[in-house]
Amino acid sequence: MSAKAAEGYEQIEVDVVAVWKEGYVYENRGSTSVDQKITITKGMKNVNSETRTVTATHSIGSTISTGDAFEIGSVEVSYSHSHEESQVSMTETEVYESKVIEHTITIPPTSKFTRWQLNADVGGADIEYMYLIDEVTPIGGTQSIPQVITSRAKIIVGRQIILGKTEIRIKHAERKEYMTVVSRKSWPAATLGHSKLFKFVLYEDWGGFRIKTLNTMYSGYEYAYSSDQGGIYFDQGTDNPKQRWAINKSLPLRHGDVVTFMNKYFTRSGLCYDDGPATNVYCLDKREDKWILEVVG
């Protein structure tokens, strides 16, 4: 497991899609051999040079949803060809290096050359030429097509946030400051600060999500709600409908997710930064700032 896994991330193994397909085909119908120069790119297409993070364009089982961010640790595929079973794998370096390979092959007369390429799809990340098999057959002859048996990938994702249990920090995506709790008007209230000591737990019930502080200075006053003026305070009990929030991401939530919180009572108002007289976390009309969820520990 990478060092990154200790910082709120974990490595998990998932089933992925892998297929063999014709990467290059040439029929030499002449009476002499023919040389052909072939150029291939092995590894991931469209690699971001600044980060190895991939954004899923489709789900991976129940683990990764569309839009989730992850990194690829390795890919492993077992396959059968010519009545034999084999296994091939790509390391993290091989996946991301996008290596260009050039070489020349010689095709005998009256023969068909087929290059079978093994491609893998990991949440929309297209990994080409994991492996290749070159086959020469008579033109019109029977080919031995390789078949995938199993295909798995190790991916690095944010640790899952278990509702009602996992302690998190909530960070303003633009300002890079954390939600903290201070006393205002003899109530615990939310404001931004640089301290990482303030922890929260997310809950979900019939009315939406609730945000519980673990750092209230008034016993029992712990669920974030929007006042009529838009200030964010922490309330007793769970009956107040202004405590309910909608999160713009499907479950499961994970470390590093960037989300918005829209109030379920003031339905057009979202959790946001605003430079108020004493605190600066508000729920305001037609506002929905982005917040980063960070797993604690």
Curated annotation (Swiss-Prot):
Q: Looking at the record, which segments are called C-terminal receptor-binding domain?
A: 157-297
Please indicate if the UniProt record lists Transmembrane as a keyword.
yes
The record's disulfide annotation reads 272-283
| Organism domain of life | Eukaryota
Applications (biotechnology): This toxin represents an excellent tool for visualizing distribution and dynamics of sphingomyelin in cells.
Q: Which region ranges are annotated with the description N-terminal cap domain?
A: 10-33, 108-156
What is the annotated tissue distribution of the protein whose record heads this document? Expressed by coelomocytes.
Q: GO MF annotations for this entry? A: toxin activity
Location of the protein in the cell: Secreted; Target cell membrane
Site (Important for activity): residue numbering on this chain: 209
Site (Crucial for binding sphingomyelin and inducing hemolysis): residue numbering on this chain: 20, 245, 291
CDD domains per record = PFM_lysenin-like
GO annotation terms (biological process): defense response to bacterium; killing of cells of another organism; monoatomic ion transport
Instruction: Give UniProt keywords alphabetically.
Output: Antibiotic, Antimicrobial, Cytolysis, Disulfide bond, Hemolysis, Ion transport, Membrane, Secreted, Target cell membrane, Target membrane, Toxin, Transmembrane, Transport
- At what residues does the UniProt record annotate the site feature described as Crucial for binding sphingomyelin and important for inducing hemolysis? 187
Q: Where is this region: Beta-hairpin domain?
A: 34-107
Mutagenesis / variant outcome for changing residue 20 to A? Loss of ability to bind sphingomyelin, and to induce hemolysis
The UniProt entry's GO CC annotations, sorted and at most eight, read: extracellular region; membrane; other organism cell membrane
- Residues bound to an N-(acyl)-sphingosylphosphocholine: 185, 227, 233, 282
| Keyword field contains Protease | no
Protein family according to the UniProt entry: Belongs to the lysenin family.
Q: What's its job? A: Pore-forming toxin that defensively acts against parasitic microorganisms by forming pores in sphingomyelin-containing membranes. Has hemolytic activity and is also cytotoxic to spermatozoa of some species of invertebrates and many species of vertebrates and to amphibian larvae, guinea pig polymorphonuclear leukocytes, chicken fibroblasts, normal spleen cells and various tumor cells. Is lethal for various species of reptiles, amphibian, birds and mammals. Induces smooth muscle contraction.
What is annotated about its quaternary structure and interactions? Binds to sphingomyelin as a monomer by using its C-terminal domain. Forms a nonamer when sphingomyelin/lysenin ratio is lower than ca 500. Oligomerization, but not binding, is influenced by the fluidity of sphingomyelin.
> What is the protein name stated in its UniProt record?
Lysenin
Gene source species: Eisenia fetida
